[in-house]
Regions:
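Non-catalytic, usually N-terminal nucleic-acid engagement modules in DNA/RNA processing proteins
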Residues: 3-186
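Short gly/pro-enriched beta-turn/loop segments at secondary-structure junctions
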Residues: 188-190
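Glycine-rich phosphate/ribose-binding loops and adjacent secondary-structure elements
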Residues: 179, 183, 192-233
Length: 233
């Protein structure tokens, strides 16, 4: 119990950089590369839970902090004993930090050093996300892998803004880590915090961000700001 995430490469292709691997966490193993069904509000749409387990054989699914926070709300998930019990899925779950949804779905968002204020796309109520309360929310949701709160710049976006945004993401990461390190998991299994590399489509910024994030020495790192409208090349 409570072991840290471990990643091992299980096979490599001599003619390319393709490889397969295995991620081991408290709740089991995830063989990579993996298709991770999206269960935004906890459940994967159009699929019964038994199909998810028996037919699709999903080793991990994704939930979304922004959506779960707004509906059904963290209190309900917490009372149910965490997201796994709430949706009756005993394999690994990853939650993203809600950063992207704040920028793409909500209106009147205001980004400051402290965090982001935004209006719910459901009923227009105003909320405030900070690196600290996003970690708290994800602790209470109880996913196995939780993402750091970042700013996802839009595409296209000028160099100056992307650089400023990337630096903010790095400062927020420091705060995420400090909150994560000073809080405990609530449901008796280890959670892994994963930071996100930003930098838009600018190669030098991507490199700076990757180098900065590697310094934190997390068990895994994510690549953010992809599939936000940029061309495939």
């Amino acid at each position: 119990k409570n072991k840290l995430m471990i990643f091992e490469i299980t096979s490599e292709d001599s003619k390319s950089k393709a490889r397969t691997g295995k991620i081991t966490i408290d709740r089991g193993e995830i063989n990579t590369p993996i298709f991770m069904p999206v269960g935004t509000l906890g459940s994967v749409r159009g699929v019964h839970q038994h199909e998810l387990t028996d037919d699709i054989k999903s080793e991990i699914i994704l939930g979304n902090t922004y959506h779960l926070f707004l509906r059904p709300g963290v209190e309900i998930i917490n009372k149910a004993g965490g997201i796994h019990k709430f949706i009756n899925f005993d394999k690994p779950i990853l939650t993203d930090s809600g950063g992207y949804q704040v920028y793409s779905l909500s209106e009147n968002r205001k980004i400051s050093e402290e965090g982001v204020s935004f209006q719910s796309h459901i009923d227009g109520t105003t909320h405030f996300f900070t690196p600290e309360n996003v970690i708290d929310i994800q602790r209470r949701i109880g996913a196995d892998i939780i993402m750091a709160f970042d700013e996802c710049p839009p595409y296209p976006c000028d160099y100056k803004y992307v650089k400023k945004s990337m630096n903010l993401t790095h400062r927020w990461l420091k705060r995420c880590k400090s909150k994560f390190d000073s809080t405990a998991n609530l449901y008796g299994f280890n959670q892994t915090l994963v930071p996100i590399v930003q930098g838009g489509t600018y190669k030098d910024l991507r490199k700076i961000s990757a180098q900065k994030i590697v310094e934190f020495n997390f068990p895994a790192n994510a690549i953010g700001g992809l599939s936000v409208g940029e061309p495939h090349d």
